[in-house]
Amino acid sequence: MNDATPEFDVQSLRTVRAIADTGSITAAAASLGYSQPAISQHLRRLEARLGVAIVERVGRGVRLTEAGRVLARHAPAVTHAFDAVAEELAELRGLRTGVVRLVAFPSASPVLVPRLLASLAASHPGLTLTYVEAEPPEAVEAIREDRADIALTFSYPGDRDDPHGSSARGLTVRSAGRDDLLLVLPAGHSGVESVSELAEQTWIAGCPRCRGHLLELCDRAGFDPRIGFETDNAVAVEGLVAQGLGVATLPRMAVDSFPTLPGVQTSPLPSAEARGLHIVTARDAERVPSVSTVLAVLGRELAAVAGARS
């Protein structure tokens, strides 16, 4: 080996990255499932191999040195490459095992994710899929920081060509279909031919970060919506509409995740708009057999859910 080539192991890199993410050795140990002495031992072994300090004391805590920050910055790419090697070797041995980390938006949780988990359990019992809910910006960040392997995300009309802006640069973003946007109106409403007919209504909207599509929709219809209630809970949205307190839009996936409440009716937007669904991974992630398997099953389940609606 070239004397200039540093010698380190994957677990040590994961340790350094965990310290960077959590800010302390104690928190890093908890996140990795190790004891604090074990983490300290990883660090001492790594520092001995490299001949440089990785952490330094600051008051009662620690922080990464410049060398530590270099390791933390490159750790996700290096550990992903090592994982890919291990997975491919396992595939050559005929093993169908591994852990794949999925992150997806909340409205995917009630229907799509359980179907995916059940399908994988039946077809690949040795494969473990972990799942965390997150909105698209956080999901993309999880991919970039190697805290997830697959992210299921969405984007609304107007940003579909580059669904997550510069945050997804260097990642792979695949189209995964569409999720129709529905008008949510009180039961018995005669319906509308244009959203402009609802200009005088009170609107129920999501959080400020989540309502951009509604504001754009109303702007194109020539009015600013009067937002009286703010919630990201689809059941709460329908509850407010059922009491005649306002109108709203919801994605079909959210509407289909629970029985429509009495007093509510839904219909596609007159403009037939939908949010785009996307699958985000690191570059070449599909070369890892377990990730490729989950991607294939996820694609089938997305198609099955879409087909059940038609």
Specify the residue positions occupied by each region the protein language model found.
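Short helix-boundary/capping micro-motifs
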Residues: 17-33
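A short LG(V/I)-centered, amphipathic sequence patch enriched
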Residues: 47-69
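Central regulatory/effector-binding core of bacterial HTH transcription factors
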Residues: 97-161, 231
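A late-sequence structural motif
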Residues: 112, 264-310
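Hydrophobic hinge/microswitch elements
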Residues: 135-140, 144-148, 154, 209-265
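Secondary-structure junction motif
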Residues: 154, 184-185, 195, 200-221, ...
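Beta-alpha-beta core module
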Residues: 162, 166-174, 179, 235-284
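Flexible hinge/capping segments at coil-to-helix
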Residues: 165-203
